[in-house]
Design a protein with these regions (language model features):
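A short, N-terminal "cap"/entry segment at the start of jelly-roll beta-barrel domains
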Residues: 1-45, 58, 91, 135-145
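A short beta-loop-beta micro-motif enriched in histidine and acidic residues
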Residues: 34, 38-44, 54-71, 86-87
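Conserved hydrophobic/aromatic beta-strand scaffold that supports enzyme active sites
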Residues: 37, 46-50, 68, 90, ...
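A generic "binding-loop/recognition-motif" signal
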Residues: 44, 53, 64, 75, ...
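Short, conserved beta-strand element in jelly-roll/cupin
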Residues: 50-52, 63-78, 82, 122
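Short beta-strand His + acidic residue motifs that chelate non-heme Fe in jelly-roll/DSBH
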Residues: 57-59, 78-79, 101, 107-113
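A short hydrophobic beta-strand segment most commonly corresponding to one strand
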Residues: 68, 115-131
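Short acidic-glycine-tyrosine-enriched beta hairpin
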Residues: 83-103
Length: 145
């Protein structure tokens, strides 16, 4: 089992699919990348995200992937719905809120605060290739298209 304190200067990389123990709050708050894959297993994946002020993750859908998101710091508005152009479910979230997104649900998360929004996301099954690291949203969009 790998035990990583991800201290002051963490070595952020994909530690999957070995057992792994770490301080998730610290790792999430230390992450400065738009998306960092920290652990990829056979049936689940953990990513850390940092959304800049006034930024968003972008409207997206995962047809075959359930998603759990927890906000560690910041303020956001969550949008979800069955149609890309009609995200009728909306909620304000901040630190310690959890968001559950069923497979096949369109969604977006918008940072409405003045500080970066720090969150982590669990995908089941994995959504991104092993070791995915996107420094910016633009990097993520380039890779996905």
């Amino acid at each position: 089992m790998r035990n990583c304190n991800l201290g002051e200067h963490p070595k952020i990389r994909d530690y999957g699919s070995e057992p792994f123990v770490f301080n998730i709050r610290h790792a999430t708050n230390m992450n400065r990348n738009f998306r960092t894959t920290l652990w990829t297993g056979q049936d689940m994946q953990l990513t850390l995200m940092c959304i800049p002020a006034c930024g968003d993750i972008g409207v997206e859908i995962h047809p075959d992937v359930d998603q759990f998101i927890r906000v560690e710091s910041g303020k956001a508005k969550v949008y979800m719905g069955s149609c890309r152009n009609h995200l009728q479910e909306q909620a304000w979230v901040d630190e310690n809120f959890a968001i559950l997104i069923p497979a096949g649900t369109w969604h977006n998360i918008v940072n409405v605060g003045v500080c970066p929004l720090k969150l982590y996301s669990l995908y089941a099954p994995p959504q991104h290739p092993y070791g995915t690291l996107h420094c910016t949203k633009e990097d993520a969009e380039r890779e996905e298209h």
